[in-house]
Amino acid sequence: HADGVFTSDFSRLLGQLSAKKYLESLIXXXXXXXXXXXXXXXXXHSDAVFTDNYTRLRKQMAVKKYLNSILNGKR
């Protein structure tokens, strides 16, 4: 019984870690795309681009913090 409980808990933990890695890779890929977009549009509307990218980054950071809190069992 103890082995089954350990295996179940360990499998759940591995699933959470996999989900966390996947979401972090999505966030990192979106941040890299935002940085590339900022470099391409450096001349035109730089203030608006900065504000938009900053807002996206803040939202991504908030999502990452929320997901980390859920995956780590805190709310």
Swiss-Prot record:
Quick one: which gene encodes this? VIP
Q: Name one Pfam family in it.
A: Hormone_2
- The scientific name of the source species is Sus scrofa
- Spell out the family assignment given in the record's similarity comment: Belongs to the glucagon family.
Source organism phylogeny: Eukaryota, Metazoa, Chordata, Craniata, Vertebrata
* Residues with the Isoleucine amide modification: 27
Identification of the protein by name: VIP peptides
Location(s), subcellular: Secreted
Principal subcellular localisation of the protein: secreted
Spell out the InterPro entries in the cross-references: Glucagon_GIP_secretin_VIP, VIP/GHRH-like
